[in-house]
Protein backbone atom coordinates (compact mmCIF):
# COMPACT_ATOMS: atom_id res chain seq x y z
CA UNK A 1 0.00 0.00 0.00
CA UNK A 2 2.86 2.37 0.81
CA UNK A 3 4.49 1.67 -2.54
CA UNK A 4 1.17 2.30 -4.34
CA UNK A 5 0.73 5.68 -2.63
CA UNK A 6 4.23 6.68 -3.56
CA UNK A 7 3.78 5.56 -7.17
CA UNK A 8 0.59 7.55 -7.54
CA UNK A 9 2.38 10.70 -6.41
CA UNK A 10 5.21 10.23 -8.91
CA UNK A 11 5.13 11.93 -12.28
CA UNK A 12 5.60 10.06 -15.58
CA UNK A 13 9.29 11.01 -15.61
CA UNK A 14 9.74 9.57 -12.13
CA UNK A 15 8.09 6.30 -13.18
CA UNK A 16 10.57 6.07 -16.07
CA UNK A 17 13.39 6.61 -13.59
CA UNK A 18 11.91 3.93 -11.35
CA UNK A 19 11.77 1.48 -14.27
CA UNK A 20 15.41 2.23 -14.99
CA UNK A 21 16.24 1.66 -11.33
CA UNK A 22 14.34 -1.61 -11.35
CA UNK A 23 16.33 -2.79 -14.38
CA UNK A 24 19.65 -1.68 -12.90
CA UNK A 25 19.11 -2.13 -9.18
CA UNK A 26 22.69 -3.18 -8.48
CA UNK A 27 24.07 -0.05 -10.12
CA UNK A 28 21.47 2.10 -8.38
CA UNK A 29 22.34 0.65 -4.98
CA UNK A 30 25.39 2.89 -4.75
CA UNK A 31 23.34 5.99 -5.57
CA UNK A 32 20.71 4.97 -3.03
CA UNK A 33 23.31 4.54 -0.31
CA UNK A 34 24.82 7.88 -1.30
CA UNK A 35 21.45 9.65 -1.05
CA UNK A 36 20.60 7.91 2.21
CA UNK A 37 23.88 8.90 3.85
CA UNK A 38 23.51 12.48 2.68
CA UNK A 39 19.91 12.62 3.89
CA UNK A 40 21.00 11.46 7.36
CA UNK A 41 23.89 13.96 7.43
CA UNK A 42 21.78 16.86 6.18
CA UNK A 43 21.88 18.53 9.61
CA UNK A 44 25.61 19.14 9.38
CA UNK A 45 25.90 19.34 5.58
CA UNK A 46 22.67 20.55 3.99
CA UNK A 47 22.13 18.98 0.58
CA UNK A 48 19.58 19.70 -2.12
CA UNK A 49 17.72 16.46 -2.79
CA UNK A 50 14.83 16.70 -5.19
CA UNK A 51 11.48 15.27 -4.08
CA UNK A 52 11.83 12.74 -6.91
CA UNK A 53 15.12 11.46 -5.50
CA UNK A 54 13.63 11.33 -2.01
CA UNK A 55 10.66 9.26 -3.19
CA UNK A 56 12.87 6.89 -5.17
CA UNK A 57 15.03 6.51 -2.09
CA UNK A 58 11.95 5.65 0.00
CA UNK A 59 10.78 3.09 -2.56
CA UNK A 60 14.16 1.42 -2.78
CA UNK A 61 14.41 1.40 1.01
CA UNK A 62 11.01 -0.27 1.28
CA UNK A 63 11.86 -2.82 -1.44
CA UNK A 64 15.18 -3.62 0.24
CA UNK A 65 13.42 -4.16 3.57
CA UNK A 66 10.92 -6.51 1.92
CA UNK A 67 13.73 -8.34 0.15
CA UNK A 68 15.64 -8.74 3.40
CA UNK A 69 12.53 -10.03 5.20
CA UNK A 70 11.86 -12.64 2.52
CA UNK A 71 15.45 -13.79 2.09
CA UNK A 72 16.53 -13.89 5.71
CA UNK A 73 17.99 -17.17 6.91
CA UNK A 74 15.82 -19.04 9.38
CA UNK A 75 16.73 -18.09 12.90
CA UNK A 76 18.38 -20.70 15.03
CA UNK A 77 21.84 -21.96 15.82
CA UNK A 78 24.33 -21.58 12.98
CA UNK A 79 25.03 -24.65 10.92
CA UNK A 80 28.15 -26.42 12.04
CA UNK A 81 28.22 -29.11 9.35
CA UNK A 82 28.83 -28.36 5.68
CA UNK A 83 26.12 -29.25 3.17
CA UNK A 84 28.12 -32.23 1.89
CA UNK A 85 30.01 -34.19 4.54
CA UNK A 86 33.74 -34.27 3.89
CA UNK A 87 35.29 -37.70 3.51
CA UNK A 88 38.39 -38.27 5.63
CA UNK A 89 41.61 -38.35 3.63
CA UNK A 90 43.14 -41.80 3.54
CA UNK A 91 46.79 -42.06 2.67
CA UNK A 92 47.65 -44.98 0.44
CA UNK A 93 50.47 -47.26 1.53
CA UNK A 94 52.80 -46.39 -1.40
CA UNK A 95 52.62 -42.61 -0.80
CA UNK A 96 55.51 -40.98 1.00
CA UNK A 97 54.53 -38.83 3.95
CA UNK A 98 55.30 -35.17 3.33
CA UNK A 99 58.51 -34.10 5.00
CA UNK A 100 59.13 -30.51 6.05
CA UNK A 101 61.52 -28.59 3.80
CA UNK A 102 65.11 -28.85 4.95
CA UNK A 103 67.70 -26.40 3.76
CA UNK A 104 70.74 -28.03 2.18
CA UNK A 105 73.82 -27.97 4.39
CA UNK A 106 76.15 -25.04 3.88
CA UNK A 107 77.26 -21.76 5.32
CA UNK A 108 74.31 -19.35 5.10
CA UNK A 109 76.53 -16.35 5.85
CA UNK A 110 78.51 -16.70 2.60
CA UNK A 111 78.09 -13.71 0.29
CA UNK A 112 76.63 -14.27 -3.16
CA UNK A 113 79.96 -13.73 -4.95
CA UNK A 114 81.57 -16.62 -3.05
CA UNK A 115 78.73 -18.97 -3.87
CA UNK A 116 78.46 -18.04 -7.56
CA UNK A 117 82.05 -17.13 -8.36
CA UNK A 118 85.22 -15.90 -6.72
CA UNK A 119 85.00 -13.08 -4.25
CA UNK A 120 87.15 -10.67 -6.26
CA UNK A 121 85.44 -11.30 -9.63
CA UNK A 122 82.98 -8.44 -9.38
CA UNK A 123 85.70 -6.05 -8.20
CA UNK A 124 87.87 -6.95 -11.18
CA UNK A 125 84.97 -6.45 -13.59
CA UNK A 126 84.34 -3.03 -12.08
CA UNK A 127 87.97 -1.97 -12.58
CA UNK A 128 87.99 -3.24 -16.18
CA UNK A 129 84.74 -1.42 -16.92
CA UNK A 130 86.21 1.72 -15.40
CA UNK A 131 89.27 1.37 -17.67
CA UNK A 132 87.05 1.04 -20.75
CA UNK A 133 85.05 4.04 -19.63
CA UNK A 134 88.25 6.09 -19.32
CA UNK A 135 89.31 4.83 -22.77
CA UNK A 136 86.00 5.94 -24.29
CA UNK A 137 86.41 9.36 -22.67
CA UNK A 138 89.89 9.57 -24.16
CA UNK A 139 88.48 8.96 -27.65
CA UNK A 140 87.04 12.44 -27.63
CA UNK A 141 90.37 14.01 -26.74
CA UNK A 142 91.60 15.89 -29.85
CA UNK A 143 95.25 16.12 -28.77
CA UNK A 144 95.78 12.35 -29.03
CA UNK A 145 94.23 12.06 -32.49
CA UNK A 146 93.33 8.78 -34.23
CA UNK A 147 96.09 6.80 -32.51
CA UNK A 148 94.22 6.86 -29.20
CA UNK A 149 91.24 5.14 -30.81
CA UNK A 150 93.31 2.16 -31.83
CA UNK A 151 94.95 1.61 -28.45
CA UNK A 152 93.27 -0.32 -25.68
CA UNK A 153 93.97 0.44 -22.05
CA UNK A 154 96.97 -1.39 -20.54
CA UNK A 155 94.91 -3.47 -18.10
CA UNK A 156 92.73 -4.78 -20.92
CA UNK A 157 95.79 -5.79 -23.00
CA UNK A 158 97.58 -7.91 -20.45
CA UNK A 159 96.34 -11.38 -19.57
CA UNK A 160 94.86 -12.17 -16.21
CA UNK A 161 97.03 -13.53 -13.41
CA UNK A 162 94.36 -16.10 -12.47
CA UNK A 163 93.94 -18.89 -14.99
CA UNK A 164 90.42 -19.80 -13.87
CA UNK A 165 89.20 -16.21 -14.04
CA UNK A 166 86.20 -16.17 -16.34
CA UNK A 167 86.36 -12.42 -16.98
CA UNK A 168 89.89 -12.22 -18.40
CA UNK A 169 90.63 -10.75 -21.83
CA UNK A 170 93.28 -12.72 -23.76
CA UNK A 171 95.07 -11.42 -26.88
Swiss-Prot record:
- Keywords assigned by UniProt, alphabetized: Late protein, Virion
Q: What induces it?
A: Expressed in the late phase of the viral replicative cycle.
Q: Which GO terms describe its cellular component?
A: virion component
Instruction: Specify residue ranges for compositional bias: Acidic residues.
Output: 161-171
Q: What does the UniProt entry say about where the protein is found?
A: Virion
- In this chain, the stretch annotated as Disordered covers 68-112, 152-171
**Record family assignment:** Belongs to the asfivirus H171R family.
Protein's name according to its UniProt entry: Uncharacterized protein H171R
Biological source species: African swine fever virus (strain Badajoz 1971 Vero-adapted) (Ba71V)
